[in-house]
Curated annotation (Swiss-Prot):
Residues involved in S-adenosyl-L-methionine binding: T152, G176, D198, N236
Broadest EC class assigned to this enzyme: transferase
Function: Methylates ribosomal protein L11.
GO molecular function list: protein-lysine N-methyltransferase activity
CC per GO annotation: cytosol
NCBIfam families linked to this entry: prmA
InterPro entries to which the protein is assigned, alphabetical: Ribosomal_L11_MeTrfase_PrmA (IPR050078), Ribosomal_PrmA_MeTrfase (IPR004498), SAM-dependent_MTases_sf (IPR029063)
Record-given protein name: Ribosomal protein L11 methyltransferase
Compartment list: Cytoplasm
Organism ancestry: Bacteria, Pseudomonadati, Pseudomonadota, Betaproteobacteria, Burkholderiales
Length: 298
């Protein structure tokens, strides 16, 4: 069955009402995206302790809905773009969605990712490269972290570098663990006491499943699971929550330990240094595709 996609632009204050209207107009699904994604105007939406609740959408939101027929999609567009209905709603496109073997398509988009020549992230449906002496088996899922993003790769390179330098990671905290990829990487390179925490329970479950699939032992839970001091604290989130979390994250680093932060754009380096200055001296450890890895020794 061919489906049709209706794409609209809408301001943030109309997102919830627009989504309800689409549902009433027989939309099969509705998703909301940042209309400025992959541009300098891109906005991050997140929720962390101590921060206001995230908005329902972006200032300029792209609302994508699926319909069972072109006629239904066009009828919905006519209603929603009428001047007396949603003043800020703009029609972008109505288009057929090609029929796909979604499993095969997804698998084709995720291939082994090289972290170092000997350390790879490999989906379960792929054979590992011959040169891979260390690997993480990981399939794409609901939680962030498959190794394809520069921030994840930089964190994993740092972890691998500690292993190569015979610097055991010992007790590790992965704050904002997502898929658990950093915690699993730490286990692969010698960490023996690992706490992986996230505010999203789906991420916690994903971390547990991925740890089991990789035959590593760790403790996954909500943020209150993080207790005491750690030799290594890893946080791959985004710059704004990293600034808010500065006192908390630094309080978990033991004397002589390391703090490693990612999810930071190059232009945000000075902001992070200022936020962490009362606790430590952040330095840029790595950079890739406009993103940087920052860290400090305590």
């Amino acid at each position: 069955m061919s489906l049709f996609e209706l794409i609209l632009l809408a301001p943030v204050d109309e997102i919830e009402t627009l989504s309800e209207a689409l549902d009433a107009l027989d939309a099969l699904s509705v998703s909301v995206e940042d209309a400025d994604a992959q541009t300098p105007a891109e906005q991050a939406l997140f929720g962390e302790p101590g921060m206001p609740p995230p908005k329902a959408g972006w200032e300029r939101s792209r609302v994508v809905s699926l319909f069972a027929s072109e006629a239904l999609a066009r009828d919905a567009a006519s209603v929603l773009t009428a001047q007396d209905f949603f003043a800020g709603c703009q029609l972008v496109a109505i288009q057929a969605v090609p029929e796909q073997d979604w499993v095969r398509l997804t698998q084709s988009q995720f291939t082994p990712v090289e972290i170092t020549p000997e350390f790879w992230i490999v989906p379960t449906w792929h054979e590992p490269p011959e040169q891979a002496k260390q690997l993480i088996r990981l399939d794409p899922g609901l939680a962030f972290g498959t190794g394809t993003h520069p921030t994840t790769r930089m964190c994993l390179r740092w972890i691998a570098g500690q292993g190569a330098a015979n610097k055991p990671l010992a007790r590790v905290l992965d704050y904002g663990c997502g898929s658990g990829i950093l915690a699993i990487g730490a286990a692969k390179f010698g960490a023996v006491d690992i706490d992986a925490v996230d505010i999203d329970e789906a991420a916690v479950e994903s971390t547990r499943a991925n740890a089991e699939a990789n035959h590593v032992t760790l403790n996954a839970g909500l943020p209150d699971k993080a207790v005491g001091a750690y030799q290594t604290v890893l946080a791959n989130i985004l710059a704004t929550p990293l600034k808010v979390l500065a006192p908390l994250l630094c309080s978990h680093v033991q004397k002589g330990g390391s703090l490693v932060l990612a999810g930071i754009l190059e232009r945000q380096a000075d902001e992070l240094k200022a936020a962490y200055q009362p606790y430590c001296q952040l330095q840029v450890l790595d950079q890739e595709e406009g993103w940087i890895l920052m860290g400090a020794r305590f």
